[in-house]
């Protein structure tokens, strides 16, 4: 194919260390001249997970391709200049992922057989490629370590934003509570909060931001701050949700949103006022009874549309009663058969441990163990968060 076209691709320039004047080594020239143009129709695999790598390496020249894991989960998107399967030229490993064309994709390709033939005739080709691959790998490792370090700091910051000392609440004569968040990545989009509004009103909530990773964590921090700021003013809960929603909609060009279940417990009347902003419905256990999912109508999620009205709803939480809040990382946990945990399994899990419902920490520990037992080693795909409160 046209070697001059290849020399204009930025990633090829970087990989093969092509100078600004377009000067290349004999080895690089032989390698690029051996490449051929291939067109992959929309929806067709460029490489397929588990297959041999005899077709070698591809470089995208036009179009976009999606990368899928062994479980067919979308994990990355590739575009012009991205390399696909370069390690296939130097080893016999099977493909580690599937790369599928999104629309027609034009690639430059060199097969493993052709690469071996050229390398046999011109050892500079092999040396050039290995040197460039080593340089690229070294840069990737360095960049990965930098990102890992930054994510570790982000994890510490996020952990510090979530309450993990519940002793001040548990000293209250009226409640026993705990909460926990286990992110799917270094940082997550789930969050919870609990705080006293005044001497007789306690707010507790759970929420789930769309997406994962650092963007979700940043949006989470904003949402948590807005909700708490308005709630501590003593505003009606519907107004708290409405104002927080409007703030999250402002300049929200990424169109992120938050599902949330926000509660205010009146310690004198046992009445819980709550707002359900598109979140999973919690379970309540009445004293000496089974856990049952509450019945409630959903409001709009936070951050999706401005000036949306939110309606308050109510439930009673008397002495001995418990409430369990959770995010969809619980019910959408997968087992090796790719089956969802679901509401029915969650109900059974809760009721298997209802005898320990008065011990908040032990109960939440048991629920995490139940989710892990169901997953049976399957990778956690979403943040898993729980909030548990029992009335003394």
Whereabouts are the PLM-identified features?
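Short beta-strand segments in beta-sandwich/barrel cores
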Residues: 36, 45, 64-69, 83, ...
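Active-site-proximal, acidic helix/loop segment immediately C-terminal to a metal-coordinating Asp/Glu
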Residues: 215-233, 317, 321-378
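Cyclic nucleotide-binding regulatory module and flanking cytosolic helices
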Residues: 1-44
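Cyclic nucleotide-binding regulatory domains
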Residues: 44-103
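… and, occasionally, acidic/histidine-rich disordered N-termini of signaling adaptors
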Residues: 142-322, 373, 378-392
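Short strand-connecting beta-turns/loops that link adjacent beta-strands
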Residues: 52, 70-72, 92, 104, ...
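A small-molecule sensor/coupling module
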Residues: 27, 113-144
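Short hydrophobic beta-strand segments that form the core of ligand-binding sensory/regulatory domains
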Residues: 88, 97-100, 105-112, 192-193, ...
């Amino acid at each position: 194919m046209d070697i001059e076209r290849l020399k204009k691709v930025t990633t090829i320039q970087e990989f093969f260390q092509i100078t600004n004047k377009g000067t290349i080594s004999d080895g690089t020239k032989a390698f690029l001249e051996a490449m051929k143009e291939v067109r992959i129709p929309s929806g067709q695999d460029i490489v397929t997970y588990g297959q041999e790598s005899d077709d070698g390496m591809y470089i995208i020249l036009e179009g976009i391709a999606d990368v899928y894991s062994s479980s067919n989960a979308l994990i990355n998107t590739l575009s012009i200049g991205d390399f696909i399967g370069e390690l296939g030229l130097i080893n016999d490993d099977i493909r580690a992922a599937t790369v599928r064309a999104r629309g027609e994709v034009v690639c430059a390709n060199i097969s493993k057989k052709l690469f071996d033939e050229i390398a046999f005739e011109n050892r500079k080709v092999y040396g050039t490629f290995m040197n460039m691959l080593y340089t690229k790998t070294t840069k990737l490792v360095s960049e990965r370590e930098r990102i890992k370090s930054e994510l570790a700091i982000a994890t510490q910051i996020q952990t510090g934003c979530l309450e993990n000392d519940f002793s001040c609440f548990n000293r209250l004569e009226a409640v026993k509570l705990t909460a926990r968040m286990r992110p799917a990545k270094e940082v997550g989009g789930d969050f919870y909060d609990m705080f006293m509004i005044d001497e007789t009103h306690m707010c507790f909530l759970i929420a789930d931001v769309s997406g994962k990773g650092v963007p979700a964590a940043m949006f989470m921090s904003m949402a948590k701050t807005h909700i708490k700021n308005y709630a501590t003013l003593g505003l009606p809960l519907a107004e708290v949700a409405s104002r927080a929603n409007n703030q999250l909609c402002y300049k929200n060009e990424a169109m992120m949103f938050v599902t949330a279940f926000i509660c205010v417990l009146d310690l004198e009347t046992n009445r819980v006022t709550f707002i359900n902003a598109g979140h999973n419905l919690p379970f309540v256990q009445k004293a000496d009874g089974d856990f049952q999912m509450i019945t409630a109508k959903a409001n709009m999620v936070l951050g999706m549309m401005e000036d949306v009205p939110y309606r308050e709803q109510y439930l009673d939480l008397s002495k001995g009663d418990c409430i369990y809040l959770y995010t969809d990382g619980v019910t959408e946990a997968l087992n090796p058969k790719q089956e969802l945990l679901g509401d029915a399994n969650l109900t059974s899990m809760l009721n298997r441990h209802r005898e320990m419902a008065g011990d908040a920490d032990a109960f939440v520990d048991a629920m995490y163990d139940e989710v892990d037992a169901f997953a049976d080693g399957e990778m956690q795909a979403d943040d898993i968060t729980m909030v548990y409160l029992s009335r003394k």
